[in-house]
Amino acid sequence: MKKKILIFSLAYYPKHIGGAEVAIKEITDRISPDAYEFHLVCNRFDSTLPRTQTIGNVTVHRIGLTTNNPTMGDLRKLPLHLNKLTYQWQAFWAAKRLHTTEQFDGVWAMMAHATGVPAGKFKRAFPGVKYVLTLQEGDPPEYIEQKMKPFGRTFGEAFTRADTIQVISTFLGKWATCMGYVGVPVLIPNAVNTGHFTQPYSETDLDAARAELGKKPGDVFLVTTSRLVYKNATDDVVRAIALLPANVHFAVYGTGPDQTMLEKLIVELGVTDRVHLLGHIDHAVMPQYLKACDIFIRPSRSEGMGNSFVEAMAAELPVIATQEGGIADFLFDETKNPDQPTTGWAVNADSPEQIATAVNDIMTRPEKVQTVTTTAQAMVLAQYDWDLIAARMQSEVFEPLFRDT
């Protein structure tokens, strides 16, 4: 018999999405609607969006405060910024109302800090409904726990009431155990659209992207696709640029609260002609611009997993990163991980000097770069494809969850 699952997510398509929302859509699009019926409760944010809408295999129910056609930046301002707080109660009541007519077999919460509170409350109210929690958090656990302290034990119940916890990294699995989950977390990482990021581009297309970037012959372009926030350490790359030869540039695709700080730092270090803040990039054209550059970098101070790294590996770019959090599951360094096939260049957090050393190594060892990028792409194709991940979610999470019902 078909099972009905209600998903809790702060946001959803078509606007204001991140890696968590991408994961929901990629997974649900690949699961047969004959086996599972998905509903989702999220914030509406934009008054032009309908309150109820079917997107792919998901029926979306929107709640919360709205303004007309807000930007991502508007979501961090009043009144929309209040939605993160009010969702903790409104989502529970919306789910409760929906349950009276839909009679859900299970609920699925996307990230503990975002939706674990309403999902845990729903499980307390309806103990017969199965509950899956997915951990995709990128911030340090201690920061999240401090932030959620006002919710008291209800935040802890996001973990302890879960029938299954699925995590995207070993690091997050350890956090689930520390928070009181008594089962064994199911480790299923996020994935990427491998066909999208491995697609070939003509030299004409790549030259067009290079021209737009202002890339000249002999230039080496580092690139990142990252929110401009503290954890992503874009500032460390800017500091590293000042230590590198004048032909090394840094293309930054992303927006966020750190932008003003970065603009000041770029001026202070005298690298205004070599660091390019390019704003948002559409996912549809991202592979073209990645391949027009030479090195992907994000020296994260914390990371749940990081889809951007895997996307860059699929595009056959050499990757420089830390091994913080979930990155350690897939980025293996020649020196730090001699027992693993090398898939990237690992640096310590907060170390512009190590970043500069890694960039110089990549620029002077083309044979190593070819070997590493080939190895990394093969790993991504074998382990991080959405078809594989969706199949694993069905066989390792949903089917066992409902086996006895």
Residue positions per predicted region:
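Conserved donor-binding/catalytic core segment of Leloir-type glycosyltransferases
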Residues: 6, 166, 216-232, 238-241
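A short, histidine- and acid-enriched strand-loop-helix "catalytic/donor-clamping" loop
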Residues: 113, 125, 131-148, 164
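Carbohydrate-associated surface elements
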Residues: 171, 191
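Short alpha-helical donor nucleotide-sugar binding micro-motif in glycosyltransferases
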Residues: 280-281, 288-293
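Aromatic "clamp/platform" in nucleotide-sugar-dependent glycosyltransferases that forms part
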Residues: 301
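Short hydrophobic beta-strand element within catalytic cores of glycosyltransferases
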Residues: 318-321, 326-331
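Conserved acidic donor-binding segment of nucleotide-sugar-dependent glycosyltransferases
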Residues: 330-352, 361-366
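A short, well-ordered alpha-helix in the C-terminal region of glycosyltransferases
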Residues: 361, 368-382
